[in-house]
Amino acid sequence: MKIKTNAENERLLSIVDVLRKEQKPFWRRVAELLAKPKRHRPEVNLRKIEKLAKEGDTIVVPGKVLGDGRLTKKVNVVAFNFSESAKKIMEEAGAKYMEIEEYYKKNKEAKDAIILT
């Protein structure tokens, strides 16, 4: 059975393909989580990031970041998708956010990054 492809699926498949080839266990784990069906991919609320992250941490969410809760810490959040409300709250808090592809290109070592599911 052929997988239905749309822009999001093509983007996802290309990211998973690149990350699976990476030798670092961190990126292989991210690829494994991204390869799951959408209904099984992590969805993390800002409330959870606020609770578990420290100031300046880099949090990687191999799924979607949702805007429930508030964020007071200046953290770097990396994810496959962000809700509009999450983007707005992070901007107001001074936190930075970027997509997984962009972060991977800038920081292949992923030192000090934390996977949050």
Per-region residue spans from a language model:
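Extended polybasic, low-complexity segments that bind anionic RNA or targeting/receptor surfaces
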Residues: M1-T117
